[in-house]
């Protein structure tokens, strides 16, 4: 993709089918919903991960904020062109592996990833590379999905129901 100076609005429409596997580390943080994540949120998450792991593990960031978001100055009337670029976002689809960790124990990695996930505007899950397709989701998230459009979409997708294709 070309990095234009100003983009049109970017909408997240589907599930992630490419960046849904843990490729570099042993553990990963997966997005359970779609959202736009800013560069500041990615940096805050990275800092939390490195502080939690201290000097033991290594962190990979799998998302990059490449889409500019524009805004007009305060108290400026409409018209006169598109506003200036205010910040950059990374579009994240459900199922995207956002961060990966290696070199730390299972317990430390899980705790670090779930604690760092609180810095992001999406619900996150923990993926273990050795347990293919296994995701630790909190019960509150699963309960919140029941009867929603997202739950129906998950049920419609045959491969997505057992989470083999989406999160392996």
Where do the PLM segments sit?
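Ribosome-associated RNA-binding proteins
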Residues: 1-168
């Amino acid at each position: 993709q070309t990095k234009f100076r100003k983009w049109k609005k970017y909408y997240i429409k589907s599930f992630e089918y490419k960046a849904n596997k843990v490729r570099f580390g042993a553990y990963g943080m997966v997005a359970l919903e779609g959202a736009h994540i800013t560069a500041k949120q990615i940096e805050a998450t990275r800092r939390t991960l490195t502080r939690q792991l201290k000097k033991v593990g290594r962190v990979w960031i799998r998302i990059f904020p490449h889409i500019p978001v524009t805004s007009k100055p305060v108290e400026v009337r409409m018209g006169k062109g598109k506003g200036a670029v205010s910040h950059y976002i990374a579009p994240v689809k459900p199922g995207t592996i956002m961060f990966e960790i290696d070199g730390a124990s299972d317990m430390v990695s899980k705790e670090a990833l779930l604690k760092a996930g609180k810095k992001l505007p999406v619900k996150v899950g923990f993926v273990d590379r050795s347990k293919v397709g296994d995701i630790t989701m909190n019960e509150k998230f699963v309960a919140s999905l029941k009867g929603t459009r997202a739950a129906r979409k998950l049920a419609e997708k045959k491969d997505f129901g057992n989470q083999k294709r989406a999160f392996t």
